Each structure stands twice: as structure tokens, then as C-alpha cells.
Amino acid sequence: MGLRTPLYELHVALGAKMVDFGGWDMPLHYGSQVEEHHQVRRDCGVFDVSHMTVVDVAGEQATAYLQHLLANDVARLGETGKALYSAMLNEEGGVVDDLIVYLTEHGYRVVVNASTRDKDIAWMQAQAAGFKVDLQERGDLAMLAIQGPNARVHSSELVSPARAALIRELKPFQGRAEGDWFIARTGYTGEDGLEIMLPAAEAPGFLNELVGAGISPAGLGARDTLRLEAGLNLYGQDMDESVSPLAANMGWTVAWEPVARDFVGRRALEAQKAAGDQPKLVGLVLEERGVLRAHQVVRVAGIGEGEITSGSFSPTLNKSIALARVPAATGDRAEVEIRGKWYPVRVVQPSFVRHGKPLI
């Protein structure tokens, strides 16, 4: 038996197929994964993401600590409520994990991945040496992601007037507390939506209200195809500790200025940048029948080979798509080996669908 979120019993009651994910028993789907995917793209759906790790960072040197820990710069946040996407790097420039950090009234809130919890907490604690900072893991919270073009409208109808007002006011990539709830306009689907952190004891009741109001529960299967269509990386597949953010389409998350900010992994990244020899993460589109899968070989004529990191059938585009790490000189055409046969693929920017609209 794996770890269970506060919503486990409710998932079972709703007919979810439960699977192991990073040591957690999580819903894969509640019937039709494809229908759950379409529901999020066209209206909205709700995901249990309570397995994610939430850490509050406070203390007089909290800002300096995070400026050391993260490749992106929390000084960019500017005002309470703003959010920032970043990576934690090791000294070799590899990605320890990717995360979102919010500037709160009392410090910062960091949300990291579930499958990397133990190593992330250990890394954050090790890097805190020498800083006057307090790290508090918030195991008392559950987290629901309500995603889709109508997510905010439907959600605001089910909460208190103060929380509804906050939902209406939030701009993309903002998150603020209202009582003991923390409501953020963030997500992992390429659609508008909310991620709500609330006391674990209140989560089953709120999920019941959402489902009762017609908001469909969605599982890990739909979450994966949605994030792939949006071109959003999955840690452990599209990047890990052996991969530089420069080779994972995450170069935009590295804050090079100010030059004096010596974040972990900076020197390694500077050397990689100067050498200019890092591969790149691209999108692939299979125009023929077949399915692109992780670890399939990508061949670029006259240049070299790469590998698919994430691949699946796209319900929105009705064709197979993938993210792949390929040589930097790769153009707009390549081939992928599927069951011993080579198939032509189109090379595109690593983002296929945003806000329900195809980008390819």
C-alpha cells in the first residue's frame, strides 16, 4: 500500500482506477481518460494534487537563501502574491527539481514535486546552512487543481464571498491567502485555472461540492496528456539531475542578472552557455499513424541522434506528439524509430496547445 492523500476514499467512491505514482496511490482516471482531457480543455475538471510537497520559507534571510537556492531570482516577484517558476540545480548544473515559489505576506511558499519529496527536502535543508531561515513542510494541507476555461467561474460559485472575490481578482501566476486557504491562478494543463491549498480536513467536503456541481474529477492520465500538449516538462522524464535547464527548454527560467548572484550551479551553466554545445528540447509531430513514446530514438539526417523524453497521442490534435532532446543544429524534420521502422516527424516548438487552441 502506498501513501494516500486525504481524498483517497473519495476517489475510490467515485470509481477511480488507482495506480502508484512516486509512492502515492493516485487516480489514473475515473472512466474515460480522453473524456477527462476534453472536459478540461472545453469546460473544467478537478485534480487531486495533494501529493505535491508544500514548504513555507520564512526568516530574515529567506530572500537571500532562495536567491542562492534557485536558478531564477525571487527578487523578480516584486509584490506579495506573485509566483515564479524555477529550478533547483546541483553544482554540475543538473536539475534537482522544478518548482513554483510564491511571495506571501509571511515569506515564501514553495511547491515541489511529489516523487522527489525526500531528496528535495534534504537538498533545501542542506543549502540552508549559514542562512537565518526557517523551512516548514506543510503536511497539514491538501491541494486541488481546478483547471479549464470555466474553472474560475464555476469555482467562485461554491466558495465564500471573500474567496470568490479573490478568485475574480487574481491575475495569471498570482496566489494569495484568504483565511486558511491559499488560492493561486496557476496550473499544469495549458488552460486557465486554480490551484487551491486548504486544510486537509476540508478537502473531501470541497471536492464533493465541486463534483456535485458538475465539475468532473480527472486523473493522472489526463493530466499527463494535457501537460504534454502544453509543452510542460515532467520531472524524471524531460529533465533530471543529469540534464541542464539549457537542454530542457528552461533557459528562460535562469536569471543571469545580477552577475553577483552566485546561485547553485551558476558556474556550470556559464561554462555550458559559453561552450554552446547543449542539445535542445523540441516538439515532434507524427503525421502518419502510430504513437510516439518516451525513449524512442530520433534520427536527424547529417547531424546525429536524439531521444524522445515524453510522447503520447494528443486528444486535442488527434495525432501523436512528443518532446525530444535532439542536437542543437536540428532543423524542422527528423525521423523516429517505431518498432524497427523509421517514420518522418515534423520538428516544432515544444508547445502544441494553449488555451484550447492548436499552436502547430
Curated annotation (Swiss-Prot):
GO CC annotations on file: cytosol; glycine cleavage complex
Pfam families: GCV_T, GCV_T_C
Main enzyme class: transferase
GO molecular function terms attached to this record: aminomethyltransferase activity; transaminase activity
Disulfide bond is among the record's keywords: no
Keyword terms, alphabetized: Aminotransferase, Transferase
Database matches in Gene3D superfamilies: Aminomethyltransferase beta-barrel domains, Aminomethyltransferase fragment, Probable tRNA modification gtpase trme, domain 1
Listed EC numbers: 2.1.2.10
Disulfide bond positions: none
Function: The glycine cleavage system catalyzes the degradation of glycine.
Summary of subunit composition and partner proteins: The glycine cleavage system is composed of four proteins: P, T, L and H.
UniProt name for this protein: Aminomethyltransferase
Organism: Pseudomonas aeruginosa (strain ATCC 15692 / DSM 22644 / CIP 104116 / JCM 14847 / LMG 12228 / 1C / PRS 101 / PAO1)
